[in-house]
Regions:
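Signature of uroporphyrinogen-III synthase
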Residues: 21, 288-432, 437-440
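Ser/Thr/Gly-rich flexible loops in soluble cytosolic domains mediating phosphotransfer, phosphorylation
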Residues: 94-123, 199-211, 359-391, 427-429
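A conserved helix-loop-strand patch within extracytoplasmic ligand-binding domains
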Residues: 80-81, 87-146, 203, 393-400
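Small-molecule-sensing regulatory modules
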Residues: 2-49, 53-54, 61, 128-129, ...
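Alpha-to-beta junction loops
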Residues: 69-78, 165-170
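Immediate post-signal peptide segment of exported/extracytoplasmic ligand-binding proteins
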Residues: 1-5, 113-116
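Short, well-ordered beta-strand segments
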Residues: 5-7, 76, 94, 120-121, ...
C-alpha cells in the first residue's frame, strides 16, 4: 500500500488530531506508512483580526485544501467546525471518527472567584450571546456584569494570554483541552506539562449544552480528500463513524438555514444517546429572531405508552394515600466535610440542605441545571452537570485526572458506580399516622 500523506495545520492540537486519524488508519491497515505534513494557514498567520471579522471564510482550511488539489497530500484533517458550511468542488469530507466532547469549557482564575465585574476572553459571537445570561446565574459570585474580549491563538497561547492579562476567564472547546491532556505521545510533552501547570491556578467549569449549545461540528474531525481519489476514500470508509457524520451534517444544515459562518450567534448540538437523541439550539439570528429549543426524541424501544390514557394518578380512595416527609441523616455533614480531592455528585439540591461546607479541592457535579443554580446561590463552585440526562448517559468527570466519586442522595438511592453518602431519608405516613404539622 502507498504511503498515506496526512496534512494539517501546524498547531499542537492540529498535529495531535492528525496523529489520531493516522493511528486509526493503522488499526485497520497496520502495514501502511503514514507521512505527516504541516502547514500554516491564513488564520494562523493573522492573529490580530477576530475570526468573525475576517473577510473570507475557511481561513483555517482553504490553504490546506489547495495542497490536496495539488496532490501534495492524500487527506487533510480539520476541526470540522472550522470548515465552511458550503464545500467547494474538487474535495469532499470523506469520513470522520469518534467525536470528542461537544461542550465548551470555562477556565477561571481562582483569585477572581468573588469578583462582581468579570471579563472573559472569547472571539465567538455564539459564546458571548449564550453565556452572557447563563453565567450571571451559574457563577457563585453572581456577577453584575460580564465583559467579553476577543482573543486569538492556539490553546497554549490563549491560556498564557489569560494568565498574563487582567482578564478573569477564558472559554474554549473542551475537546481541545481533552485531546491535549489525553495525548500520550512524547512529541508535545512540554506543551502538555505547561497546560497542566497553569491549571493549578485555575478553576474550571464544563458548560451545559442545554444553556450553551456548541458550534456545529464542535468536537468532530473532518477528513477531507480529493473527490476523485477512490483509493483513499475506500481506506477512509473503514474508519468512518457514520452516526457522528450524520449528527454533524444535521447541525451544519441547521446553521446553514440561518446563513452559516462563525459570525452567527447560534449554537446547535445534536447528541446521540443510548435512549434516543437530543437537539439543543440556542442563540439569535441576524434578523433578531431568538432561538431556544431542547428537543428529546426517544428510540422506539424506549417509548412507554402504557400511561398515556391515565387521567388520575392519585388513589381513588383517599385513605389509601401515602404522605412523605424528608428527614436529615445524622453525621452525613461531618462525613462529607472530611472528603478531599474527590468528586461530589449531587443528585438534587435538597440533598445538601444541611451541608454548609465542601472542601474546595473537590469537584462538584450536579444532576441538572436546577440543582446547579441552587448550589451556586449558596456559594458553591459547580464544575458541571449531567444536564438531566442521568449520571450514566452524561457521567461526571474530572478533566485533569481520574478521581473517586461520591453520590449525595437519599438512603434508598438506586445502586450506583459511586459510593453513596445518604444525607436524608423519606419517611412515609398514612392519613392515620400523619403528624400534626402536616394537618391544615
Amino acid at each position: 500500500m502507498k504511503t498515506i500523506k496526512i496534512i494539517s495545520r501546524k498547531s499542537h492540537l492540529a498535529q495531535i488530531q492528525a496523529e489520531i486519524v493516522g493511528m486509526k488508519i493503522l488499526q485497520y491497515f497496520p502495514t501502511s506508512k503514514i507521512e505527516y505534513i504541516k502547514k500554516d494557514t491564513q488564520g494562523d498567520i493573522d492573529l490580530d483580526t477576530p475570526l468573525h471579522k475576517m473577510p473570507e471564510i475557511g481561513v483555517f482550511t482553504n490553504d490546506i485544501r489547495e495542497e490536496l488539489i495539488n496532490n501534495s497530500a492524500d487527506l487533510a484533517v480539520h476541526s470540522w467546525k472550522d470548515l465552511p458550511v458550503e464545500m467547494e468542488q474538487g474535495t469532499i469530507i470523506s469520513a470522520t471518527i469518534d467525536r470528542a466532547d461537544l461542550r465548551d469549557l470555562l477556565i477561571f482564575k481562582k483569585q477572581s472567584i468573588t469578583k462582581k465585574n468579570i471579563s472573559l476572553l472569547t472571539s465567538s459571537p455564539r459564546r458571548k450571546e449564550n453565556l452572557s445570561s447563563f453565567l450571571l446565574k451559574a457563577l457563585p459570585s453572581k456577577p453584575e456584569e460580564i465583559q467579553f474580549m476577543d482573543i486569538r491563538g492556539n490553546i497554549l497561547t490563549r491560556i498564557k494570554k489569560l494568565m498574563e492579562s487582567d482578564a478573569d476567564g477564558l472559554v474554549m472547546a473542551k475537546a481541545a483541552i481533552d485531546r491535549i491532556i489525553e495525548d500520550e505521545s512524547r512529541n508535545f510533552l512540554k506543551e502538555k506539562e505547561e497546560v497542566l501547570n497553569y491549571f493549578k491556578d485555575l478553576n474550571w467549569m464544563v458548560l451545559p449544552l442545554s444553556e450553551n449549545p456548541a458550534a456545529p461540528a464542535q468536537g468532530a474531525l473532518a477528513i477531507e480528500t480529493r473527490s476523485d481519489d477512490e483509493e483513499t476514500i475506500e481506506i477512509l470508509n473503514k474508519i468512518n463513524n457514520s452516526e457522528v457524520f450524520r449528527s454533524v451534517e444535521k447541525e451544519r444544515a441547521i446553521l446553514k438555514k440561518y446563513g452559516g459562518g462563525c459570525h452567527q450567534k447560534i449554537g446547535v448540538s445534536h447528541q446521540l444517546l443510548d435512549v434516543g437523541e437530543i437537539l439543543n439550539l440556542k442563540g439569535e439570528t441576524e434578523d433578531g429572531l431568538r432561538l431556544y429549543e431542547n428537543i428529546f426524541t426517544p428510540k422506539e424501544s424506549f417509548k412507554d405508552d402504557s400511561l398515556e390514557n391515565v387521567k388520575n394518578f392519585y388513589p381513588e380512595n383517599p385513605e389509601n394515600s401515602s404522605f412523605f416527609d424528608r428527614q436529615n441523616i445524622k453525621d452525613s455533614a461531618k462525613i462529607l466535610k472530611e472528603i478531599t480531592n474527590a468528586g461530589i455528585y449531587v443528585s438534587r439540591s435538597n440533598a445538601l440542605d444541611e451541608i454548609k461546607e465542601i472542601d474546595r479541592s473537590n469537584i462538584i457535579w450536579t444532576s441538572g441545571i436546577k440543582t446547579w443554580l441552587s448550589l451556586s446561590n449558596r456559594g458553591f463552585w459547580v464544575n458541571g452537570t449531567s444536564d438531566s440526562l442521568g449520571e450514566m448517559e452524561s457521567p461526571p468527570e474530572n478533566i485533569l485526572k481520574k478521581i473517586k466519586w461520591y453520590k449525595i442522595s437519599h438512603d434508598a438511592s438506586p445502586i450506583s458506580d459511586k459510593e453513596t453518602i445518604s444525607t436524608y431519608k423519606s419517611v412515609s405516613y398514612t392519613h392515620l399516622t400523619l403528624p400534626t404539622k402536616f394537618v391544615v
